Amino acid sequence: MRIDIITVLPEMIEGFFNCSIMKRAQNKGLAEIHIHNLRDYTEDKYRRVDDYPFGGFAGMVMKIEPIERCINALKAERDYDEVIFTTPDGEQFNQPMANSLSLAQNLIILCGHFKGIDYRIREHLITKEISIGDYVLTGGELAAAVMADAIVRIIPGVISDEQSALSDSFQDNLLAAPVYTRPADYKGWKVPDILLSGHEAKIKEWELQQSLERTKKLRPDLLED
């Protein structure tokens, strides 16, 4: 898989992709992450990527020209499954969406900034608009990092223990069951006996029960679908 991220602040996320699972995925050749500085696609001496909005609205708007140049340059080299725009008013990102996007070969993620992008970009070049939550960030860079991480980590081979990824919260619309490690008794705080029993079937039953109980308590909306 290849993910191309277009941003006005590449330094905000470069370090994120050079450590932990994201670095491992790239070292294994299972994922490529390419970060593109939108200012490299400007043609004026000030390398401006924003301008004042028509209508006298507050804030600044990302310009069409550099964004189109960057996207077109990438599309000239390969086909893309989706051109994604990170925006608070997009479709809510969730685990099923991450699962679906992990099957793609090539993705572009355009990070929003300032007041937003010229809407014509959204009308003519963007294929999918995604939000990671009902709140506003300084820019879409953190949202792009969140999405890339969720997508890449479930590519087969990225995580050594694939069952670990498959049992994460939200994979089956349930929150994950509690997990414990040694010591089994710490200051009287004990691990549930069932987990020490070695009885695989009963442990699985306990795991499902815990997942259901936690979901009912913390995220009952997940059980409404």
UniProtKB/Swiss-Prot annotation:
Enzyme class, UniProt record, top EC level: transferase
Domain of life according to the entry: Bacteria
GO cellular component: cytosol
Molecular function in Gene Ontology: tRNA (guanine(37)-N1)-methyltransferase activity
Protein name per its UniProtKB record: tRNA (guanine-N(1)-)-methyltransferase
HAMAP family given in the database record: TrmD
Binding site for S-adenosyl-L-methionine: 112, 132-137
Organism whose genome encodes this protein: Bacteroides thetaiotaomicron (strain ATCC 29148 / DSM 2079 / JCM 5827 / CCUG 10774 / NCTC 10582 / VPI-5482 / E50)
Quaternary structure annotation from Swiss-Prot or TrEMBL: Homodimer.
Subcellular location: Cytoplasm
One Pfam short name: tRNA_m1G_MT
Keywords carried by this UniProt record: Cytoplasm, Methyltransferase, S-adenosyl-L-methionine, Transferase, tRNA processing
The UniProt record lists the keyword Cell cycle: no
EC number: 2.1.1.228
Catalytic activity: guanosine(37) in tRNA + S-adenosyl-L-methionine = N(1)-methylguanosine(37) in tRNA + S-adenosyl-L-homocysteine + H(+)
UniProt-listed GO biological process terms: tRNA N1-guanine methylation
Record's function text: Specifically methylates guanosine-37 in various tRNAs.
Family stated for the protein in its record: Belongs to the RNA methyltransferase TrmD family.
